[in-house]
Amino acid sequence: MEQALKQARLAFDKNEVPVGVVIVCRLNQKIIVSSHNNIEEKKNPLCHAEIIAINTACNLISSKNLNDYDIYVTLEPCAMCASAISHSRLKRLFYGASDSKHGAVESNLRYFNSNSCFYRPEIYSGILSEHSRFLMQEFFQRIRSAID
């Protein structure tokens, strides 16, 4: 999760919502992909950290199934990202801070408990959540102060 937090800080420095991700091979515990939100730079609402990481990992291993991999995310995934995690069959999802507004794992939609869920990973929440939460608060305070 510390590496995912480093990615979130990179996003923060680029004025992106500070969400970071790493995908880790379960067999050797090596990070195969790291990413962060890139929506503003790419001018593309699909460039969430999780989507970028999953796409890169699938291309890297030439497979749509990531069942030998885990994903670490600094913020609870939204519905789009939860669906991508499900469809790529990532074995385990570890995330930091909950997202009471857009979270789709345990906060709002609870995608993995829905009938439309394709596959449910093992889910572990609250990992270094205070660090993720602080970074998000700092980011949005900066945004609000720029508006004022």
UniProtKB/Swiss-Prot annotation:
Question: What is the protein's known function?
Answer: Catalyzes the deamination of adenosine to inosine at the wobble position 34 of tRNA(Arg2).
Q: Which residues form the CMP/dCMP-type deaminase domain?
A: 1-116
Q: What class of enzyme is it?
A: hydrolase
Q: Which gene encodes it?
A: tadA
Species source reads: Rickettsia prowazekii (strain Madrid E)
One GO process term, biological-process aspect: tRNA wobble adenosine to inosine editing
- What is the designated name of this protein? tRNA-specific adenosine deaminase
Is this entry keyworded Zinc?
yes
Instruction: State the active site.
Output: 50
Kindly give the InterPro entries that the UniProt entry links to this protein: APOBEC/CMP_deaminase_Zn-bd, CMP_dCMP_dom, Cytidine_deaminase-like, tRNA_aden_deaminase
Q: Which family does it belong to?
A: Belongs to the cytidine and deoxycytidylate deaminase family.
Instruction: Please name one Pfam family that this protein belongs to.
Output: MafB19-deam
Q: Which UniProt keywords apply?
A: Hydrolase, Metal-binding, tRNA processing, Zinc
